[in-house]
From Swiss-Prot:
Subcellular location: Cytoplasm
Tagged with keyword Transcription: no
Protein name: Adenine phosphoribosyltransferase
Known role: Catalyzes a salvage reaction resulting in the formation of AMP, that is energically less costly than de novo synthesis.
Gene source species: Rhizobium meliloti (strain 1021)
EC number from the UniProt entry: 2.4.2.7
Molecular function (Gene Ontology), one example: adenine phosphoribosyltransferase activity
Keywords: Cytoplasm, Glycosyltransferase, Purine salvage, Transferase
SUPFAM superfamilies hit by this protein: PRTase-like
Any single GO BP term: purine ribonucleoside salvage
Similarity comment text for this entry: Belongs to the purine/pyrimidine phosphoribosyltransferase family.
GO cellular component, one term: cytoplasm
Primary localisation category: cytoplasm
Length: 180
């Protein structure tokens, strides 16, 4: 484990049995509230793409907005909010995606991405990968070229990374936690 990984892990609060028994919730609000750790996380996520053409950063609601906005700023790229259905005011494109216990829908503005735009997809954590997979499919459906999907946390036992890689998406994560 690197010093950066140790720093990030120590900045994340772990809450047992939330939102239900048997789940260990990884709360990044403590990382976001720590200026040094927040900057370190953003710098580590951005570093591999400095000097790479990135047109847009797409953030998945809600923590992906915080991280994605900061990453877009660092890369001088635009930002695309990917939201739950019914939350965007203009003409949207929507996709259904699988959750652990059902199906939901997410959307983005139809004019948010142009065919061929180089896009980085961002969220705080990848677990089962259903939400990230849906967002990646939505972006690809609109013609985006996904440069990478970036997350602070990976829960590798839940297989989300593999879902994105099966779509041809390069996945970057900073730290891993065991379990759920």
């Amino acid at each position: 484990m690197t010093a950066v990984q140790s720093e990030l892990i120590s900045a994340i609060r772990s809450i047992p049995d939330y939102p239900k028994p048997g789940v260990m919730f990884r709360d990044i609000t403590t990382l976001l509230g720590n200026p040094r750790a927040f900057r370190r996380a953003i710098d580590e996520l951005v570093h591999p793409y400095a000097g790479t053409k990135v047109d847009k950063v797409a953030g998945i609601e809600a923590r992906g907005f915080i991280l994605g906005g900061a990453i877009a700023h660092q890369l001088s790229a635009g930002f695309i909010p990917i939201r739950k259905k019914g939350k965007l005011p203009h003409d949207t494109v929507r996709i259904a995606y699988s959750l652990e216990y059902g199906v939901d829908e997410m959307e983005m503005h139809r004019d948010a991405v142009a065919p061929g735009d180089k896009v980085i997809l961002v969220d705080d954590l990848i677990a089962t990968g259903g939400t990230a997979e849906g967002a990646a499919k939505l972006l690809k459906q609109m013609g985006a070229d996904i440069v990478a999907a970036c997350f602070i946390i990976d829960l590798p036992e839940l297989g989300g990374r593999k879902k994105l890689e099966a779509l041809g998406v390069n996945v970057r994560t900073l730290i891993e936690f065991e379990g759920h």
